[in-house]
């Protein structure tokens, strides 16, 4: 492990940064892909704050790849690496549906195939791990509408979705589906010396060590699914309560580098919702654990988001048995995020609210 260099994309994001920290703590050397020198400086500052003097600096480096879809974009970055973990997703700012086929789908496929081609050209890469999503495996109907006759598992594959897309989430899903299908087809056709593993997390929740203020945590991420309720927002659009802790996501990605884990397979990452689970149950948890913050109005705790398809079920036994852990339950996920929110200052303020948990 000590001489194993991992190329990591997406290190400046919520999931990727947690994977970066876990890699360094496990003794790996990491070359993080960044899009600009400024991003690299910011990443190093956050890493210094989180690692708190740990002996890691001689095992961490950055490399700039400004455009992920350029031919050969990752070739130089992948040189002399043993593993690649590709977490980065397309950055999409357009609200024009005419742009989404390119921005979500084609860019996602180009990025994944570009990573695989760079791994092949390197001659040193032994395994590539790609971060996908649960939406890359299952249809919208299976996730949002139909109770599971049998628990859904990571062996599922579905045909690609074609435009037009009714909303951004469908375009995002189309990109994830196309990416995994294209990557697996590439592996089958090229038969490279390395293998491929896909990770499929559900809605990722947990402490975000890139956040330095409460305002950061109020910006949209998958943590927002729960925090919007805690902070008093009322969202009419429902979602299934399928979540996983960021620590578990990082654990699975890093553990997947172990050669004892067979390659060319997928893993579903999600805790199992208990019967009767609803997003709005977060209000009971917060009232019980943080009564002072609720009384002060720091946590309004009166929001709402509908829970849809309470009958959906996942089979994550393969994930837990392969990597030797049990998924962190939803309540612990929520507590980690709310505790962090209360610990952090508001923007440009230094006031912290005491907690009871």
From Swiss-Prot:
EC number(s) from the headed UniProt entry: 1.-.-.-
Induction statement: Expression is positively regulated by the cercosporin cluster-specific transcription factor CTB8. Expression is also affected by nitrogen and carbon sources and pH, and is also controlled by another transcription activator, CRG1, previously shown to regulate cercosporin production and resistance.
GO molecular function, a single term: oxidoreductase activity, acting on the CH-OH group of donors, NAD or NADP as acceptor
Family matches, as InterPro entries: Epimerase_deHydtase, NAD(P)-bd_dom_sf, NAD(P)_dehydrat-like
Coiled-coil annotated residue ranges, if any: none
Top EC class of this enzyme: oxidoreductase
Keywords for this protein: NADP, Oxidoreductase
Residues annotated to bind NADP(+): 172
Annotated TM spans: none
Domain of life: Eukaryota
Gene3D superfamilies in the cross-refs: NAD(P)-binding Rossmann-like Domain
Pathway field: Mycotoxin biosynthesis
Phenotype when the gene is knocked out: Abolishes the production of cercosporin but accumulates the naphthoquinones called cercoquinone A and cercoquinone B. Leads to dark orange-red mycelia with significant export of colored compounds into the agar.
Annotated signal sequence range: none
Family matches, as Pfam families: Epimerase (PF01370)
Function: Ketoreductase; part of the gene cluster that mediates the biosynthesis of cercosporin, a light-activated, non-host-selective toxin. The perylenequinone chromophore of cercosporin absorbs light energy to attain an electronically-activated triplet state and produces active oxygen species such as the hydroxyl radical, superoxide, hydrogen peroxide or singlet oxygen upon reaction with oxygen molecules. These reactive oxygen species cause damage to various cellular components including lipids, proteins and nucleic acids.
Family assignment from sequence similarity: Belongs to the NAD(P)-dependent epimerase/dehydratase family. Dihydroflavonol-4-reductase subfamily.
Protein name: Ketoreductase CTB6
Native source species: Cercospora nicotianae (Barn spot disease fungus)
Gene (name only): CTB6
